[in-house]
Amino acid sequence: MARYDLVERLNGTFRQTEHALATLTENLEQQPLLIARVFSLPEVTKEAEHNPLATIAVEQHLGKEAESLALRHYRHLFIQQQSENRSSKAAVRLPGVLCYQVDDATQAALENQIQHINQLKTTFERIVTVESGLPSAARFEWVHRHLPGLITLNAYRALTVIKNPATLRFGWANKHIIKNLRRDEVLAQLEKSLNTPRSVHPWTREEWQARLEREYQDIAALPQQARLKIKRPVKVQPIARVWYKGQQKQVQHACPTPLIALINTDKGMTVPDIGELLNYDADNVQHRFKPQAQPLRLIIPRLHLYVAD
């Protein structure tokens, strides 16, 4: 019965999210659009979904065309809504911003709507990742049994609302996931894998077991106090840097989906200055500040595991 109730909540929360998104997009369409600028990125095919991106060509859209793309993007939740050739694993991203003229009452209503949508999205993600009690490998099958074709990342992804920005500038962020580990923690992880033999394509179970044993010996040979670090690259992400003149403050936002900027004319606010997102080229990345990197030696490539020399 508890599992049935959880499925009911999963479906109910998702349907509420769909309805709330539909209501929001209808309400936004009724507001005076001051300026809209979004940037579509190339479609990632199924064959290329794991390939690193050296370049990204950006196509700019303005005005009502940009608004239409953005409002459709907010409701893009299923693979059935996209090309059959597009990867269902690669995130669908549409950086940019929609700027609407609002008064005090409209601003409060839209902010409440967006907050409600984000609460529903958080609840939905918690049902899937926590309350289901399922390991990550089993969640995909469980969710898609009840919501076939769902793009879970799009369902989780929150909407970002900003108020009265002075300027917006778009760019790209290169990041790494960093995690420090002790030698014995890595040994325990490898030992767990050794005790549950399986095959991993393209290796047989015996070949994979032999690889794990070599990795175990390599780690066991290190001093107990060796400093180990997982440094896994994350695919380049579009970002927005927002400047607030009154507060003399800049805030950086991840920008996989268009920001919603509310410009309150009751308070005398004006249209912000919006920059362009340039094409990404990994060979020409310029770092504002790049600290001296700690010397690291790669010891287990598949885990992106390094040892500090």
UniProtKB/Swiss-Prot annotation:
One annotated GO molecular function: DNA binding
GO biological process: DNA replication termination
Keyword Cell inner membrane: no
Main location per the UniProt record: cytoplasm
Keyword Nuclease attached: no
A single GO cellular-component term on record: cytoplasm
Pfam families referenced in this protein's UniProt entry, alphabetically: Ter
Compartment list: Cytoplasm
InterPro entries to which the protein is assigned, alphabetical: DNA_replication_term_site-bd, Tus_dom1, Tus_sf
Function, as annotated: Trans-acting protein required for termination of DNA replication. Binds to DNA replication terminator sequences (terA to terF) to prevent the passage of replication forks. The termination efficiency will be affected by the affinity of this protein for the terminator sequence.
Family designation: Belongs to the Tus family.
The protein's name: DNA replication terminus site-binding protein
Organism: Citrobacter koseri (strain ATCC BAA-895 / CDC 4225-83 / SGSC4696)
